[in-house]
Regions:
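Sec-dependent N-terminal signal peptides of Gram-negative exported proteins
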Residues: 3-20
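Acidic, polar-rich low-complexity tracts and alpha-helical solenoid repeat scaffolds
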Residues: 17-213
Length: 213
């Protein structure tokens, strides 16, 4: 009897499946047109893929492979800017090429691209490029340059986090260079920003407290 019910259940299931299959509409016809390559998009995608591979933690542990992938991505970004100079993505490719150069230790070449971008790029790229220049200038003890670049970041930053970051770092530079009033202005700007990251608010309070001590 159990076998009978099992067979019947199987037949019912098969019948239901067949009925369901009958209600599935035919697939839409597929056009036989050739696949169209997009050299502009393909070149940028390849450069981005290589750069992403270079940033993988396992890759960074292998300095030779890390450098090889960075060099390949750099070449692709530069190829993009040369082949498609009028592309809306050309400035972004140039910025990413500069990032590759920095990571490869070729800072002078990177700075050349960043300097060009702060003259020709969108506000977002101006801010990002100026931030890189400010960071390097600060590390090199070039305080006046770093201050100018951080001010450029603040004027152009579209991302609140980047602006807050630059304001805090600018406050520190003003503090270390003997300009307490400007330092206080920067720290207060961070503390008064309701969207500022809590860690920047905390260190800005500490900086402001140091001024009042």
């Amino acid at each position: 009897m159990k076998a009978f019910f099992s067979i019947n259940a199987g037949l019912i299931t098969l019948a239901m499946f067949s009925a369901a299959q009958e209600n599935i509409p035919d697939a839409a016809p597929i056009a036989d047109g050739p696949l169209v390559a997009n050299p502009e998009l393909d070149t940028l995608d390849m450069a981005d893929m290589l750069y992403k591979q270079a940033q993988a933690p396992a890759t960074k542990e292998n300095r030779q492979e890390y450098g090889r992938l960075l060099d390949l991505s750099l070449r692709k970004y530069l190829e993009f800017t040369q082949r498609f100079p009028q592309s809306a993505q050309a400035p972004l490719a140039e910025y990413r090429a500069a990032m590759c150069l920095e990571e490869l230790g070729r800072k002078d070449e990177a700075h050349g691209l960043f300097l060009r971008l702060i003259q020709t790029g969108s506000p977002a790229l101006v801010a990002a490029s100026a931030y890189r220049l400010a960071t390097d200038a600060s590390s090199a003890g070039e305080i006046d340059k770093a201050i100018q670049y951080y001010q450029l970041v603040i004027r152009n930053a579209e991302q609140n986090d980047l602006k807050v970051d630059a304001q805090y770092r600018l406050g520190r530079l003003f503090l270390s260079s003997g300009n307490p009033e400007s330092a206080a202005t920067m720290f207060c700007a961070v503390m008064g920003n309701p969207e500022a990251d809590a860690k920047f608010v905390l260190v800005s309070r500490m900086g402001y407290a140091a001024l009042c001590a």
